[in-house]
Structure formats: structure tokens, C-alpha cells
From Swiss-Prot:
Name of the protein this chain belongs to: Indole-3-glycerol phosphate synthase
NCBIfam families cross-referenced by the UniProt entry: PRK00278.1-3
Main enzyme class: lyase
GO molecular function ontology, one term from the record: phosphoribosylanthranilate isomerase activity
Entry EC number(s): 4.1.1.48
Record has Metal-binding as a keyword: no
SUPFAM superfamilies: Ribulose-phoshate binding barrel
Length: 260
């Protein structure tokens, strides 16, 4: 069983065991009317938009430094991030909905709930905890699930980042007319990363969509490798969590977009 299949099976068990219903019952609803739109930010921003991530660990990384997360988010906003991603998976990524709830009030930036969503109930919990965006991973959803979850999230006034890893998944994302598409440079089945994967997937991209390159971006040289693919932004986690000088590092990544 791949790590991804294992994670999805775990999410299914949480749904069956009432985990998400319990979260709905115990989490206070967070009002986030002051959140900005990430899509609006992308459309207005001549430079790459940055989704800066809060993460504690992953199936491949266990040595991320502990940070004052409120300060981390404050620094993300101060030094040019356009959105914040917060992992809410507890078992594999060390996150939680409680963390999302606590941190979303620390910023006016859009906040992405990054998790493995397979059911509308998870979207309800994400919204109640204060997310303004959710992630949908094409690889773990049928076409019907993808369409239904996408439409449900939009109906809840949430923005949706649809994540793809190959060209077939990109075509599936186009079918739901996704405005925001993330290209994951990490193969979630093997957890192997190649930042230039973005170039391959976006060779025949369609216009009128916004593209985010995710995973494997460690410095400005990585960004330059994929800049001419026509990306609109980057999702960066590990490099930012390891960085001790965000005031210099974050602005270096916000390069001028190159539109082909």
C-alpha cells in the first residue's frame, strides 16, 4: 500500500468513527469575513503569489524546527506572502483543526486548509475552523467526487485549490473548470520530488486558469527553473519553516511572472 492510499484509508476510518462530527460539535465557529481572496491577489499581483505553509512534519521529514507559529504567520504576511497554508492532518503531518482555528485569526491573508478531503463533512470542519480555502487532490477522488466536493466548497464561499500530479489529472481538473490548479512536484505515491515536474505538466496548459507550483522549492534557483512554465505562484512549506531570515528569503522568491 502506498503512503497516499494509507492516508486515505485513515481518513475514511476517521469519517466512520465520528472524528469530524466531533470536531463540528467542539470547535467554535470562526468568523473570517476579513479574509482576502487569493484569486483576486493572484490577478492583481505582477509577481509570483506565495502560499506560505505551516507544517510540523511529513511522512518524509521529521526534523523541522519548532517555531512560534503566530510569529511565523506574522512574518509570512510581513514579508510578502499572499496566503497561508495550514496542515490539519494529525497523524502524518502533525497538524490539527485546533491549530488552524488558533492561527487563522492571526492574519488577514487567505488561509488554506491543507488536508486529504474525501467528504463534504471535512469541508464543513475546515470552514468552521476558519479556512477560506481548501485543497482537493484529484488523485484520491473520482470525477463525481471531485465535481461534487468542488461545487460544495464553492457554495460555502470557499476558494478551492485543485491539486494535480500528471497530465491526465490536469485534464480532470479542467472538467470542473477549476480556477486555481496546483501542480504537485512530489509524487504522492512514492513521495519523490522533482521541481521541474511543473514544466512538464504545464507544457500544454490552458488559459484562464491560475497555476501554483507545489513542493520541492528550496531557493530562488528552483523558482528560476520553473518560472517560464507560466506559473502564477508557489506553495512553499519546508524551506520557509527552516528559514531563519524570512525578511530576505521570501522577497527573493517573489519573481516577476513570465506569461507565455
Amino acid at each position: 500500500m502506498t503512503i497516499l492510499a494509507e492516508i486515505v484509508k485513515y481518513k475514511q476510518s476517521l469519517l466512520q468513527n465520528g472524528y469530524y462530527q466531533d470536531k463540528l460539535n467542539t470547535l467554535k465557529s470562526v468568523k473570517i469575513q476579513n479574509k482576502k481572496s487569493f484569486i483576486n491577489a493572484i490577478e492583481k499581483e505582477p509577481k509570483l503569489a506565495i502560499i506560505a505553509e505551516i507544517k510540523s512534519k511529513s511522512p518524509t521529514v521529521n526534523d523541522l524546527p519548532e517555531r512560534d507559529l503566530s510569529q511565523q504567520i506574522s512574518d509570512y504576511e510581513k514579508y510578502g506572502a499572499n496566503a497561508v497554508s495550514i496542515l490539519t492532518d494529525e497523524k502524518y503531518f502533525g497538524g490539527s483543526f485546533e491549530r488552524l482555528q488558533a492561527l487563522t485569526t492571526k492574519t488577514t491573508l487567505p488561509v488554506l486548509c491543507k488536508d486529504f478531503i474525501i467528504d463534504p463533512l471535512q469541508i464543513d470542519v475546515a470552514k468552521q475552523a476558519g479556512a477560506s480555502m481548501i485543497l482537493l487532490i484529484v488523485n484520491i477522488l473520482s470525477d463525481k467526487q471531485l465535481k461534487d466536493l468542488y461545487n460544495y466548497a464553492i457554495s460555502q464561499n470557499l476558494e478551492v485549490l485543485i491539486e494535480v500530479h500528471d497530465r491526465h489529472e490536469l485534464e480532470r481538473a479542467y472538467k470542473v473548470n477549476a480556477k486555481l490548479i496546483g501542480v504537485n512536484n512530489r509524487d504522492l505515491k512514492r513521495f519523490v520530488t522533482n521541481v521541474e515536474h511543473t514544466n512538464t505538466i504545464l507544457e500544454n496548459k490552458k488559459p484562464n486558469h491560475h497555476y501554483i507550483s507545489e513542493s520541492g522549492i528550496h531557493d530562488a534557483s528552483d523558482v528560476r527553473k520553473i518560472l517560464h512554465s507560466g506559473i502564477d505562484g508557489l506553495l512553499i512549506g519546508e524551506a520557509l519553516m527552516r528559514c531563519d531570515n524570512l525578511s530576505e528569503f521570501l522577497p527573493q522568491l517573489k519573481m516577476q511572472k513570465v506569461k507565455s
